[in-house]
Design a protein with these regions (language model features):
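Phosphate-binding P-loop
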Residues: 1-7
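Conserved lysine of the Walker
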Residues: 20
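Conserved substrate/cofactor phosphate-moiety recognition/catalytic segment
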Residues: 25-68
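A glycine- and Lys/Arg-enriched "phosphate-lid" helix/loop adjacent to the NTP-binding pocket
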Residues: 99-170, 183, 187-192
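The conserved Walker
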Residues: 16
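Glycine-rich phosphate-binding loop used to anchor ATP phosphates in small-molecule kinases
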Residues: 58-114, 123, 129
Length: 193
């Protein structure tokens, strides 16, 4: 993970209807960052349907391209943060839930540990599930994907994994405080003995 560019990349993950997109928008505005719309959301809007199993790599590729472009823009504009609305780890969770396919797990987990300065995990607790035809499935799906994500985040460094619950205001305040602390740690650099 490159922390020398001045911009830190943050994955904002969670199951459907957990406030990821709104939180990314709030954090980008409040913490001098950039964000991009979730590639899966864009894909579904463009195609008018959810992806099939064989189309999952297309979603991951779009995510990685958005992250690369986003980091280039964050650096060019002197931003402190890039907030990634979702991550390949979420695609892995959806692949498991909808297709019983764990084939993305190891790659997504390795990529995640190596490429994000922090992970904001948006929990379902505190936010009601809100229907969004074509984009969201059900409260049952939200809970099932949440449980899969809990399993997938276990290998992530606990100091860089921030769990968020409550309303959007509480999530924003806790995330902001946590990320400001993290940014200070990166600015100080590694401690030497």
């Amino acid at each position: 993970m490159d922390t020398t560019s001045g911009a830190l990349k943050v994955a904002v993950i969670g199951a459907e209807s957990t406030g990821k997109t709104t939180l990314c928008q709030l954090l980008a505005a409040g913490l001098d960052g950039l964000h991009f719309e979730e590639p899966l959301r864009q894909w579904v809007a463009r195609k008018g349907r959810p992806p099939r199993q064989g189309e999952q790599p297309e979603i991951v590729e779009a995510q990685l391209q958005q992250e690369l472009l986003g980091m280039q823009q964050a650096i060019a504009f002197g931003k402190r943060w890039l907030f990634c609305d979702s991550a390949p780890l979420v695609t892995a969770a959806y692949s498991r839930y909808y297709f019983k396919d764990a084939g993305f797990d190891n790659l997504a987990s390795s990529y995640h540990r190596a490429n994000y300065a922090a992970t904001l995990f948006c929990l379902p607790q505190g936010l009601d599930w809100v229907a969004e035809p074509g984009q969201r499935d059900s409260p049952k799906a939200r809970e099932a994907v949440h449980q899969i994500l809990l399993e997938l985040v276990k290998p992530i460094d606990s100091e860089r994994l921030i769990f968020l619950s409550g309303g959007l205001k509480e999530r924003y305040e806790f995330a902001s405080a946590s990320l400001n602390r993290l940014h200070s740690e990166f600015a100080r650099g590694p401690e030497t003995s």
